[in-house]
């Protein structure tokens, strides 16, 4: 899947799940399950409840996503 095919959205982490999975509420009030991208995992970026994040969603499954950026 190329980067052009992905949908980028903003959201807030509302819950931490096992295995570095997170429940994120998007700006449009939908709730999705997301995991950390490989570069964030490699650089030990910590994500906590309440952090604002940028997600990539695929058009095939809009209930799962990948966290690609954490805002302050």
UniProtKB/Swiss-Prot annotation:
Q: Superkingdom of the source? A: Bacteria
PROSITE patterns according to UniProt: S1_IF1_TYPE
Q: State a GO cellular component annotated for this protein.
A: cytosol
Specify whether RNA-binding is a keyword of the entry. yes
Molecular functions (GO terms)? ribosome binding; rRNA binding; translation initiation factor activity
Ranges for domain S1-like come to: 1-72
- Localization in the cell: Cytoplasm
Listed Pfam families: eIF-1a
Alphabetical keyword list: Cytoplasm, Initiation factor, Protein biosynthesis, RNA-binding, rRNA-binding
Q: Assembly and partners?
A: Component of the 30S ribosomal translation pre-initiation complex which assembles on the 30S ribosome in the order IF-2 and IF-3, IF-1 and N-formylmethionyl-tRNA(fMet); mRNA recruitment can occur at any time during PIC assembly.
Q: What does this protein do?
A: One of the essential components for the initiation of protein synthesis. Stabilizes the binding of IF-2 and IF-3 on the 30S subunit to which N-formylmethionyl-tRNA(fMet) subsequently binds. Helps modulate mRNA selection, yielding the 30S pre-initiation complex (PIC). Upon addition of the 50S ribosomal subunit IF-1, IF-2 and IF-3 are released leaving the mature 70S translation initiation complex.
* Family of the protein in this entry: Belongs to the IF-1 family.
Quote the protein name from its UniProt record. Answer: Translation initiation factor IF-1
Species of origin reads Buchnera aphidicola subsp. Baizongia pistaciae (strain Bp)
